[in-house]
């Protein structure tokens, strides 16, 4: 079967996807090892029998809703190719807004930054790549996530990062940081969106929080006060309908200069504040 023939067949079978053509192209690139430009320019190239079998298996899994990132094992974030697995969240483009806001507020001089619930290490590695003069600490309570983040750091040859297992601040006693960032669980366990799309294949522990999705957010806001240098920043990603509640939690905890930033879809996505000791 030719590349172009397989693409047509795959696109027709993936109409339930938000991006059937791109999904099909990614799977073909993954199995053949060829780039998109080559595949489109040489569409008459023949697939081997082994490649056809691999593609059929992947196409079935994608048709059943399994995320493309899980099928290929890789997702790009901040132009960094990251290994992903079912043990962690798949990095989303909107989380790059958190990285942008963090970089805009970091002091010019070297400092220490903490990423809570690092997962793949996406946020921490993006900050470490952009600010090689800073020392990044990234923690996750799940050992599989810690191992994956360490693998990504090694693969990207990023040295200014320390990744360890910790239940939020449990292993960080006495340490202080100029900035703390986190994309914590913030979805209500009753949210119907948990039964839709990629999140069906992602760990609930990384998605769901008690108290209508606010429990971990409030915990981080309160506990970060002891881990920030005076005037340090806390930046949190949250759900698009949680902006007001998160701002109030910051204010009640004594933070200053509290504001919410919008994502690429113009939804409230990142709330931040400064804490003075």
Curated annotation (Swiss-Prot):
SUPFAM superfamilies: S-adenosyl-L-methionine-dependent methyltransferases. Gene3D superfamilies: DNA helicase RuvA subunit, C-terminal domain, Vaccinia Virus protein VP39. Transmembrane segments: none annotated. Substrate binds at residues 183-186. Its EC number is 2.1.1.297. S-adenosyl-L-methionine binds at residues 117-121, 140, 168, 183. Pfam families: MTS, PrmC_N. One of its GO terms (molecular function) is nucleic acid binding. This is Release factor glutamine methyltransferase. It catalyses: L-glutaminyl-[peptide chain release factor] + S-adenosyl-L-methionine = N(5)-methyl-L-glutaminyl-[peptide chain release factor] + S-adenosyl-L-homocysteine + H(+). Keywords: Methyltransferase, S-adenosyl-L-methionine, Transferase. The gene is prmC. Disulfide bonds: none annotated. Coiled coil: none annotated. It comes from the Bacteria. It is an enzyme of class 2 (transferase). GO terms for biological process: methylation.
């Amino acid at each position: 079967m030719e590349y172009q023939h397989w693409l047509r067949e795959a696109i027709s079978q993936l109409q339930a996807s938000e991006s059937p053509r791109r999904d099909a192209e990614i799977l073909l690139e993954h199995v053949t090892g060829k780039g998109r430009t080559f595949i489109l320019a040489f569409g008459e190239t023949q697939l081997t029998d082994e490649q056809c079998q691999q593609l059929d298996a992947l196409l079935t899994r994608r048709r059943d809703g399994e995320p493309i990132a899980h099928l290929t094992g890789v997702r790009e974030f901040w132009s960094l190719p990251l290994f992903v697995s079912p043990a962690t969240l798949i990095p989303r483009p909107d989380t790059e807004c958190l990285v942008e806001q963090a970089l805009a507020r970091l002091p010019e001089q070297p400092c220490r930054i903490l990423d809570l619930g690092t997962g793949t290490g996406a946020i921490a590695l993006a900050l470490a790549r952009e600010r090689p003069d800073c020392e990044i600490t990234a923690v996750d309570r799940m050992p599989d996530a810690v191992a994956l983040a360490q693998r990504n750091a090694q693969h990207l040859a990023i040295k200014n990062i320390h990744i360890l297992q910790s239940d939020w601040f449990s292993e960080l006693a006495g340490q202080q940081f100029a900035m703390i960032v986190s994309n914590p669980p913030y979805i209500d366990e009753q949210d119907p969106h948990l039964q839709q799309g990629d999140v069906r294949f992602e760990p609930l522990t990384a998605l769901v929080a008690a108290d209508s999705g606010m429990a971990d957010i409030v915990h981080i806001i309160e506990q970060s006060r002891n881990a920030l240098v005076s005037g340090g920043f806390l930046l949190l990603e949250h759900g698009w309908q949680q902006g007001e509640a998160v701002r109030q939690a910051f204010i009640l905890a004594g933070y200053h200069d509290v504001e919410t930033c919008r994502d690429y879809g113009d939804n409230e996505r990142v709330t931040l504040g400064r804490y003075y000791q």
